[in-house]
Amino acid sequence: MKSKIFIACDTTSVSKVKKIIKNTQTSKLKVGYKFGLEFLNSKNGRKFVSKLNNQITFGDFKFSDIPNTCASAVKAIKDLKFNYCTIHISSGLEALKAAKKVSGKTKIIGVSILTSLDNKALKEIGY
């Protein structure tokens, strides 16, 4: 079995993402592509993602809200057929369950702490 790696497509530019995908295709690894809200909401971002039928895709959206809203957010991207999608676990177990219930084949990944937060920042917000 091939190892998997995800490449972050942290841009709003479709042309940059096309280059990233072109330059990272390899037979040695299963390569997937991570997209955040900035790309999904960019001009033509959603349209581009909808055409990535043969790619492994990861929607790193960190949805964080009440259960009904998290579920609705997951439903709203269901047509894009992401393999993975993130929900912030601070939304609570019921929100995670609600998202999972409507996710179909998309696997839900719980995000606990943002990587940009160091110990000082975590203490400032009460962790």
Where are these regions (language model features)?
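Conserved anion-binding
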Residues: 2-3, 65, 69-127
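Conserved alpha/beta-domain cores
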Residues: 9-47, 67-70
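Short hydrophobic interaction/assembly module
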Residues: 47-71
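Intrinsic structural disorder
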Residues: 1, 24-28, 85
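Hydrophobic faces of well-ordered beta-strands that scaffold small-molecule active sites
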Residues: 4-9, 31-35, 57-61, 85-87, ...
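Extended aliphatic helical segments
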Residues: 14-17, 31, 49, 56, ...
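Acidic (Asp/Glu)-rich catalytic clusters
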Residues: 21-28, 46-54, 76-79, 98-104
